[in-house]
Amino acid sequence: MNRQAILRHIILTAIVSICTFISIRGQTKDSLSVKIEDGWIEKIDNKIGIDVSLNNSYEIFEVKTEDTKFILYPNTASNLRFNVNYKFISFGFQFTPDFIPGNGEENLKGNTKSFELRTAFIFKHWFTDLSYSKVKGYYLKNSADFTTLLKGDPYIQFPDLNYYGFAISTGYSSNSKFSFRSLTSQTERQLRSAGSFIPVINLRYYSIDDRSSGMSTQKTNNFESSIGPGYAYTFVSKEKFYLSLGLQSSLGYLNTKLTTRQPDGDITTNQDNYIFRWDGKVGLGYNGRSFYTGVYTNISGTEYRQENTTAINFETRVYYHLFLGIRLAAPDYLERKANKIEKLFQKQNASN
């Protein structure tokens, strides 16, 4: 049995086992430890949420000058993500298995390996999201602009092009009647329609490194910081069905260190650029006490002008995120530990 078949078997076995476990337990604990804040938010403190999702969130690079455009894509149509969520904390990882349709066309687009870790801490008002991701192997999506491609011909490939990055985002949800968790970790349920102003600060470091054996290769080290306002609103029907709309924009600074490796020595240059980002989100979902599901669509844009050149880097993309999750009873000791941490954070906020 090959690796893909073994992985499919493990995933299916886990899903079937969990669903069977849930069906046996039924609804016996649905009403336990239910906490409702002023009729707006229901806290699900006695259960752990486990979900699996598909998304097309991956790093691409698009550079456009007056007469040339380069669009580099990894050979990954969709990512598979697993998440565990409890109270204020969420942890997950994602990768790109070949058995998902659209992945694994290595003869045509080359081989890509990617992986991401992500964790989030979401309190009453404040939240922080941290992530680490890496990708190896890209292809030139617009190869036809540089050569004549016939059906079945491979794209121009960059198997030794590597990306890795760290990111942290911190924000504040101003409306206590709005549940940010209900849209992100699903550890709460929004019972009535509400919206909130959400400013966010973003910090990001990433590197793009061509590790091929060519005579001249390049590497960039990039640091980006930005800040901007946002707003989100959740329309709720029958306390379980919801439609969410959100808009976020940010203005920031991008510093790029470019190293060109040549046989007679490295050449290093630095650039400083202002960067503008915007993001719009639409979500539709079901958030019950035993399971939850939904689909989110994001439209995002990024633009900045390279220093001392006429080149403009821009990117406009559409993302999807389809998820399905269930809730299991949390161990008592986990609930006690989490309550201590949450109370400590609340005391520090109150003292400030």
Regions flagged by a language model, labelled:
Residues E116-N221, N298, N352:
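Outer-membrane pore/translocation modules
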Residues M1-W40, F241-L243, L324-L328, A350-N352:
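Bacterial Sec-dependent N-terminal signal peptides
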Residues F166-T170, T316-N352:
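Outer-membrane beta-barrel "beta-signal"
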Residues V52, L80-Y86, L117-F123, I168-S174, ...:
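Residues on the lipid-exposed face of transmembrane beta-strands in outer-membrane beta-barrel proteins
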